[in-house]
Amino acid sequence: MKKLNICLLNDSFPPVIDGVANAVLNYAAHIQKSLGNALVVTPDYPGAKDDYAFPVIRYQSFNTEKLVGYRTGNPLSSGLLKKIGEHDIDIIHTHCPLISGYIARMLRETTSAPI
């Protein structure tokens, strides 16, 4: 069976500690270990250390932590879709309907991968 390249998009990921960030971390680790290749795409957090067994693409974000508790990613970050496309994505998983969902829809148009 062909190993799949699965892109996981989420508006939060460690160093954020919440249930959704942990779920995406666990999904990516399981995919990388057992199913294929995981790629996590998430907003940038200053000082984030991405020393995982899978690649993490962080894109430009704005500090909205005092307003909403999280940073807000810029889905129009220069070169973001090109960077993701270099990973030959087979499946797109988005765990959030907002910014990550928007990026997933743009990515679907450029890769034809299902969401």
For the regions a protein language model found, what residue spans apply to each?
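N-terminal subdomain of nucleotide-sugar transferases
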Residues: 1-61, 85-87
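Active-site proximal beta-strand in glycosyltransferases
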Residues: 6, 56, 91, 106-115
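Short beta-strand segments at enzyme active-site cores
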Residues: 39-44, 93-94, 114-115
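An amphipathic, basic-hydrophobic alpha-helix
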Residues: 63-94, 99-102, 106, 110
